[in-house]
Amino acid sequence: MRKFDLSLRSSRSSYFATFRHQLTILSKTDALDEEKWLNMLGTFVKDWFRYESHFVHGRDSLVDILKERGLLSESDAVQPLIGKKS
């Protein structure tokens, strides 16, 4: 998976280009077996949450919408990646 320099403004368009590419591949389910499709979907979701943690603020984020609807608990929510060690 491609790495992004989140300090650059161009990273936002890079994210969108990557998301479009991933969605194109995911929409062609015949080309992938189930395991590869699920792995790619997982990567897409992880990248989307990483994007949101850096660029989306307020109640417009997918994480906030899922929490409001009771589909995501606080313990499931993605924490910002800046300064975090895994």
From Swiss-Prot:
InterPro entries: C-protein. Keywords: Host-virus interaction. The keyword Flavoprotein does not apply. GO terms for biological process: viral DNA genome packaging. Pfam families: Phage_C. The keyword Transcription regulation does not apply. Plays a central role in the packaging of viral DNA into phage procapsid, which occurs in the late stage of infection. The protein C can interact with the replicative complex composed of the protein A, the host rep and the viral DNA after the completion of one round of DNA synthesis. When protein C is bound to the replicative form, the complex becomes accessible to procapsid and serves as a DNA packaging apparatus. Belongs to the microviridae C protein family. This is Protein C. The lineage of its organism: Viruses, Monodnaviria, Sangervirae, Phixviricota, Malgrandaviricetes.
